[in-house]
Amino acid sequence: MFGERLKKCRTSKGYSQQRMADFLGITRQGYGKYEIGKAEPDLKTLTKLSNILGVSTDFLLKGTHAQFDLDEILNDPETLIAGYNGMISEEQAKELLYYLLKKEFEEH
């Protein structure tokens, strides 16, 4: 259930409900409703939650991790850290992306 996963992620980070509410700009009671299943966050809030907690939105919603085809991503230069705009080499971008994906899968 979404609320249970949300609470587990929050407590594993050592965050209180109040701290999460502060991060999101809502009341503690409003945040608490997410954890007990009385309310569901909108897409913008869900994205914020996933970023704060370091998990995917798929994990929060369904308990599953997004599936990545690592070889496809690593072999497509256009998808490799496009925001770097030539500041790093393609090989460095591949290494960075591999590290980030590996870290994400190890944490979950």
Swiss-Prot record:
It comes from the Bacteria. Keywords: DNA-binding, Transcription, Transcription regulation. Residues 6-60 form the HTH cro/C1-type domain. InterPro entries: Cro/C1-type_HTH, Lambda_DNA-bd_dom_sf. PROSITE patterns: HTH_CROC1. It holds the Pfam family HTH_3. Residues 17-36 bind DNA. The keyword Cell inner membrane does not apply. Transmembrane segments: none annotated. The keyword Transcription applies. Signal peptide: none annotated. One of its GO terms (molecular function) is DNA binding. This is SPbeta prophage-derived uncharacterized HTH-type transcriptional regulator YonR.
